[in-house]
Each structure stands twice: as structure tokens, then as C-alpha cells.
Amino acid sequence: MFEIPRRPVGLAAIALVVVGLVAAGCGSSSSSGGGGQKIALLLPENKTARYETQDKPLFEKQIKADCPKCSVIYSNANQDPAKQQAQAEAALTQGAKVLVLDAVDAASADVIVKRANAQKVPVLAYDRLIPNANIDAYVSFDNERVGKLQATALTQKLKSSGTAAPTITMINGAPTDNNAALFKKGALSVFNTSGVKIGKQFDTPDWSPDKAQTEMQQAITALGNNGFQGVYAANDGTAGGAIAAMTSAGIQPSTRPTTGQDAELAAVQRILAGQQFMTVYKAVKLEAPAAATIAVALSKGQKPPTPPINGTTNNGKKNVPSTILTPVAVTKSNINSTIVKDGFWTASQICTGAYASACKAAGIA
């Protein structure tokens, strides 16, 4: 079983760390400023909007701040494990001094890690832990807690509506994604002790919204329109698919509270419109810079710096130096104090024509 550090660092603490590291540059090391190392950032897919709009630019910005002469070799695998392997090989051939790997799946990631190990190139597992692999660092969120936040919010919402023993549909993430297993584990730890019945449950290949829509259609066929009271969707993409299926079946999404994750713009707007109940906000503005700072150190042959490292995570092979951040549950009531306050999305981005009145009602301006 994978161990999570006991005290994940909160958002404010990591923010202070990153600011301090930028101000200090590369510290007192004789290689301060960097010598033009190449750092590979290998992201898994682009169906989840955050990777291209948040992770990539924030990572590149922090690399430039910490190591002006360093360059980033960027690749996105579009959910194709073979493609990610080829991209990793290409990065190594180009002379990458560290791989920052957000793995498509564990099996292909293990091959990449072994290849990097053979060339003495360190690997930082980004966002998704790579089980049983000889990785050098890990940066992510407390992923079991993500599932617990989702399940707790959904359970409380259903029970506050007068449903003592609700039935739900679970639309989980990709079976090849280690994080998806952790989200599910966290969620089930709540559902199994709360009197919630799981009417239908699915694992969603590739985190595909289209496949999630098909799964939800199957659940509606099996359970009936009135046979479930809520939907656990592991992220905002799968939530969108589930909501589309309910709408097509003549079910008002507002009557079936649906969870999500990633605070995607479309999801935030759905929450304001009452179509989606909640999402989980993960401050990528802290995660990506922390990974960049650690990657610069690894590229120079240095140990992962503490901070931003705040503990270790056992991946089944070793205790991996880790930065674990704290996720935040977001409903309509705290969009303004979390997502907007942090600048993840601006009010002008969220409050387009159709959502202007809902924004005003929620105090977003």
C-alpha cells in the first residue's frame, strides 16, 4: 500500500517556499544559474484542459526563473503509452538531464524509468505516482484525500436533501492511472461507511468524457431514471460526460448532484448553473513550480531540495522524496474565495454572457 506523507503542505506554505526559492535563484551552489541543462516535461494527455493551459506554462516559467540557461523539452502523449515511451527516448537522445514524467500508465512508465536509470538520468514523477519504480522525486496532491473530499461532499448533499440511504453511480478514472485508484480508494472509504449504495460503477478508459457519457447511459438503462440519486464522477471531464447523458435521458442534472475534479472552466460554469454540484481545486500554480524547482536541482546532480520537498511517499520500491499538496473542495459558495482569488480563472473568464447572473448571485465579479 502506498503511503501518503502525514502532513501535506498547505497552499500558502508552498507559495512562500516557491517565492523564496525564486528570490534565492539557485542558491549558493557553484552552478548557480544553471549551465544550459535540458529538462524534459512529459505530460499524458490534453483532454484534461489543465495540462496545456496551466501545468506546461507554469512549469516553463519556473524553470526560466530558477535556471535561465536551462531549456524544456516538452511532449504530450495524447493518452498513448507507446507515444510517451517514444517521447521519453527522444528526450534522452536529445540530452535531457532529468525527466519530469506524468505517466499515461504504470507499465509504460516503468519502462521509461528503467531506460532513464540506465543512463543515470533522474526521474521526477509528476502528479501521478509511478508504483514500484526507481524514481527520484514525486510531486502531487494527497490523492486519497481528493476522493474523500468528493465522496464526503456528495454524501452530505444527498443526506441533507432527505435521502437516508442514497444510491449513486460511480464514474471512476482510467484503470491505468495510479491516481484514479487512489481517488476511488478515498471515495469508497467514505461511501462504505455512510450507508451509500453504489448502483453501478465504471472505470473510464483514457478519462474520456465520451466514454463516461456511454457509461452513464448504461447506468441509467440499468437503474432507471429514478433509480439513483447522485453521481460520483472522478474528474470534471467525466462529470461533463455523465451530465450530458442525464440531460439526454430527460433527467435534470440539478436533481442528481455530481462531483468532479480539476476546476476546469466548463465545470466551474456548470457549478454556477446548478448542473454540477462540486469540483476539487488543486493549485497547479504551486504544483508545477515545485516540480520545476526540484527538476533543476536534479538536473545538476543535487538532491531534491527541502523545501519544497515535505516528506516521503512509499511507491512499493522505495521511500521517494515528495512534495504533497492539499486539495480543496469547491462548491458554488466558495468559487470566489478559492479559484478566482488564486487567479486560476478570472471572473471575466467565468462570467461570460450565459453565466453573468449566476456569477452575480454567487458574489463573483
Predicted regions, residues:
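Sec-dependent signal peptide hydrophobic core
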Residues: 9-18
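A residue-level marker of the well-folded mature domains of exported/periplasmic proteins
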Residues: 2-8, 26-365
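C-terminal motif of bacterial Sec signal peptides marking the signal peptidase cleavage site
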Residues: 20-25
